[in-house]
Amino acid sequence: MRILNQITARLSTVALASVLSLTYVQAQDTKTDSEGSDKEEGNRNVMLNASSANGPREIQIGLPSADVNVLDNGLPVTYATNPHSINSNWRSDASLSHVGLLKISETAITTGNIGYAVNSFTQLGQEGFNGRLDYKSNHFGLQEFSLNLNGSMGKGWYYSTSLYQDFDPGTFKIKSTPFQDRTQIYKAALTKRYGDGRGEFTAMYHYSNSHPVYNYATQSAPFIYVGDGSVKEYGDFRLGTTSYLPTENNITYRDMRTGQLKQTTLYDAIENHSSEVSLMNTYKWDNGLTWKIIGRYDNARGALVYQTPMSLINVKDNNSYNYVLRGVDGQLTPYTGEYVQTRMSCLNSGDIDELLFTSELSKKFSTSTLRVGVNEWYYDIDYTSNTTMYDQSVPSDGSYPVRVYDSNKHSGFFYDFNKNASEYYKGHENKLALYLTHDWDITPKFNVYYGARFEWQSLRGENAAVKNSNGEYVGRFADYYIGATAPDGTKITPTPLSYDWFNYDFTAALTYRLTDNFGLTGDFTYIVQHPRFENFSPATLPNTDKISVPLGRAGIYYNNSWLSLTSLFSYISKTNNNSTLNLQHDGEIMAAPLTYDIQTIGWTTDVMAHPIKGLDIHFLFTYQKPTYKKYETSVTFSDGYEGKINATGNIVAEIPQVLIEFDPSYMITKDLKIWTSFRYFSKTYANINEAYYFNGHWETFGGLNWQVNKKLSLGCTVVNFLNQTGAKGSIAGAELITKDEAKQYNGHLMTGSYLRPFTVEFSASLKF
């Protein structure tokens, strides 16, 4: 969890003003009785993703995201995304009848989570026989198929079946497996519809099996940091199309539960599977009262694997190292390369049982809608993260890296089992919540929306935050496991956990139409949470004080026959973010837990225009300033060096202060559409101390969509058509580097994440 916390808290920390970038405010929504309705944002394709070929894009709100919020039929796809990720259990495919984006206020009230939520619904059976077959490919060899068949069986009974198959080799070949994503999902639903349109009852089964190898295969790559915000490629290594993953697929680890040394493959370690049973019922009365209820049980194995780059060592002509590699004949030979990359392998996995239940009762009046809902969500997990260190070559000729080891220190490839970032927790978490909302048109010009959520959260179980006889945390050490003995003589036994908290959320939005075209709007959401079970995975207990998130927005909107404009100022903050940094010094890794706050102010202007027939233009401009508050921590390394970080007042790492989106599209004919999408991200800092930075870059998309006839549609999409290459995100092992120290590393080799390469995608959809 330490590595996941660090990645999530920094890579997912994003700018506030994009809260508004999902565009129209409530005053501009068109209310319908559809699945999406006025609870959703418009104007944004959440599946147009520059970071992934098969997942929804990250929705930016200016805070470290605890989880990606994706709802399926009103329930979270997974209760927690570590170790059971969204993409391993859900795809936007032919099995869905609707995919939208819930507003922040709706997400907060109905789930208690922070941020937008992708909102999806299953395609249930319809009259007659119906089918939809979707296909997608790209020039790297992706093969993705999705099929839904549904129909009627008579007497009000309907069926729906779906399958999804993904064979994705990624943008570069790896030796350990032919695919960087091998996912299969199957669904079957049986629906009974009541007479007179009263509603329906559905029973559904869902099975998924996924190996998201891309999670670790695309995690990092080497590049030369120039010093002016740009990077150069290292020799013949091509960012995004050359593999930085060693050829070997096996991994040795020490089981956190038993202490046994075990061996597996990375492909097997990242296997996810899930078996779900869902029951859904909707009933409508003549007086406008509607009752919706859904329950789901999920038995799953969740897994995430990280191959996190740590130290990058120049070993050329350095006699203190004696790195060797093993040939195909088993013989050891000296390693003659210039650099060695140390990696921490994190094998996260857990056996999971989820029982999620939501019930809503709503009543429509002439000028308002009142809703009352209940959540009862139960989550049981037995989780470990087994960690292993190993070293690899850093080839400059574009060849595959191989594992190496320093024979002066080790006798094999793997070492420091569970010393860094190993994790353990077992038990259950329960959330019982009552929520209500009221959407009221007080006058034809004045709308008020308000709501509240009251949540009882309980947590019972155990973890491995062990203290010694002096009351000090033991921390992790080499060959750590439950039952081991620490260097100071402390026996490692699980620490019992028992917590009960009261959480609450409030939201209110006001919209006033000054004229038929112009108006004022504002909204405020206040969320109070407490730590979730996964926050108890490190070697120290988290700060269990309340986490408060106030979000306020205010501005104007203007609409006419060809233009819609929204301009708003925003503020959001979050207290008591729990995180753990893995700080590095002279090849040693030390965990540094900390609790910090974040504050973001921003301004967003969003325009949707239809200047001439067939031409649509969307433009978004965001300025934001996300800053750390109370961000201080330190650790003392074995040589006595004290590593300190004080980032209070710094701009949040990896977050641009300026974002621009420009999305024009034109209907060449009534069946042929050409479109482009440009997204600009300004300069971002690549470490917490603002010592390294990356220049701004564009993410670009373009495509042609052809509706051949009523049954068949074809599409071609080009990702990164400007063919920009370079680095993004953070630089591995750079947390302690200061601005003054950074200058000496200009022109040095470093590792980090990178932009998605130029990709041509083809798609087809057939309805029958």
Please provide the spans of the model-predicted regions.
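Gram-negative outer-membrane beta-barrel transporters
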Residues: 444, 562-564, 568-575, 580, ...
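Repeated loop/turn-to-beta-strand initiation elements of outer-membrane beta-barrel proteins
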Residues: 130, 156-159, 196-201, 288-291, ...
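Solvent-exposed loop segments that connect transmembrane elements
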Residues: 215-261, 305-345, 391-420, 460-497, ...
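Transmembrane beta-barrel wall of Gram-negative outer-membrane proteins
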Residues: 130, 137-168, 172-246, 269, ...
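Transmembrane beta-strands of outer-membrane beta-barrel pores
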Residues: 135-139, 165-169, 194, 207-211, ...
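Acidic, small-polar-rich N-terminal luminal/periplasmic segments of exported/outer-membrane proteins
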Residues: 3, 21, 28-128, 527
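C-terminal beta-signal and adjacent terminal beta-strands/loops
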Residues: 28-30, 683-685, 706-768
